[in-house]
Regions:
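A short glycine-rich, Lys/Arg-flanked "PGG" loop and its adjoining helix->strand segment in the class I
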Residues: 127-142
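Conserved alpha-helix/loop element of class I SAM-dependent methyltransferases that forms part
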Residues: 19-44, 59
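Conserved catalytic/acceptor-binding region of the Class I
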Residues: 144-225
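Class I SAM-dependent methyltransferase SAM/SAH-binding core
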Residues: 37, 44-49, 53-103, 128
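C-terminal helical/coil "lid" or tail adjacent to the Rossmann-like core of SAM-dependent
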Residues: 2-9, 167, 199-264
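A short acidic, Gly/Pro-enriched loop at the edge of an enzyme's catalytic core
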Residues: 102-113
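A short SAM/SAH-binding and catalytic strip from SAM-dependent methyltransferases
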Residues: 112-126
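Class I SAM-dependent methyltransferase Rossmann-like catalytic core
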Residues: 1-24
């Protein structure tokens, strides 16, 4: 990212659980609006900022077969993974570009829709990022945002080590300059970025991990994050957890995965901004 701004604070190596995400389970607030836009303008241009593994980008592209999606991220490695995913799904109306959300390499008023999912919560200056997304969006276009509220996890059973893991995620993201309460702050950020209240539609949506398949996508990734990699190293370095505590958290995620009635719900703030 640009000098003076923090990067994605959890690292890029352990993002397998991101590939569970789709337009349907992670950008559902945008879909009715997108379908209306596609009907009126089949060849629309959509920018996906911080696309990561590209699963949402590819599923959005299916809703606009005559349009074009530009998927961006600051990691060439993750963009290569996103391109491979799109190719595997037969999605051809998508291109990939390394880009920094604070300095998007596009002219003013380029895109009909600008989309960002779980991007602002990792940034130290989310309002500046929204301003930049609004800049590249056409007048009358839509900026779509969805951000987790890290404080709003509902986990069962309440295994003590998992409750500690939840608090650790908050400490890690906020300790690196991110936004633990991003979901509930979207309206405030959008207003500060210059949008008028009547041009902002706010909602809240959830993720639910309760089926064996969904739980595996999340729980296995959190177990791995506890055992190895960048997130573990940073947690220890920042003094937020010890190695032994992280090992206990990994065991707790294994227990959660093996428990038939376990579940996890996470609240997300959602905003649609009309650019004027």
């Amino acid at each position: 990212m640009a000098s003076g701004h923090n990067q994605y604070c959890l690292g890029y190596a352990q993002v397998k659980h991101h590939e569970w995400r789709s337009a349907e389970n992670s950008s559902n607030h945008l879909l009715p609006k997108l379908q209306v836009i596609v009907k009126d303008n089949p060849k629309l241009k959509l920018l996906d900022v911080g696309a990561g593994s590209g699963t949402i980008s590819a599923s959005l592209a299916r809703y606009m077969p005559e349009g074009e999606v530009t998927a961006t991220d600051i990691s060439d490695e993750i963009l290569a993974r996103a391109k491979d995913y799109a190719n595997s799904q037969g999605v051809t109306n998508i291109k990939f570009q390394n880009a920094n959300v604070f300095e998007l390499p596009f002219p003013d008023s380029t895109f009909d829709v600008t989309h960002a999912h779980q991007v602002l919560c990792h940034l130290d200056a989310p309002v500046d990022a929204i301003k930049e997304m609004m800049r590249v969006t056409k007048p009358g276009g839509t900026v779509s945002l969805r951000e987790s509220d890290m404080y709003m996890w509902c986990i069962w059973p309440e295994i003590p080590a998992l409750l500690k893991f939840h608090q650790l995620q908050i400490k890690n993201i906020e300790g690196k300059g991110g936004q633990g309460k991003g979901g509930r702050q979207l309206l405030s950020w959008a207003l500060e970025a210059g949008a008028s209240r009547q041009d902002i539609t706010l909602s809240f949506g959830t993720w639910c991990y309760s089926t064996p398949e969904d739980k595996k996508a999340w729980g296995s990734a959190m177990k791995d994050r506890s055992l190895t990699g960048f997130a573990r190293e940073k947690a220890i370095e920042m003094g937020n957890a010890t190695g032994d505590e992280l090992d206990e958290m990994a065991k707790a995620w294994e227990q959660w995965l093996e428990t038939e009635d376990s579940s996890l719900g996470i609240m997300n703030g959602e905003a649609l901004i009309t650019k004027r």
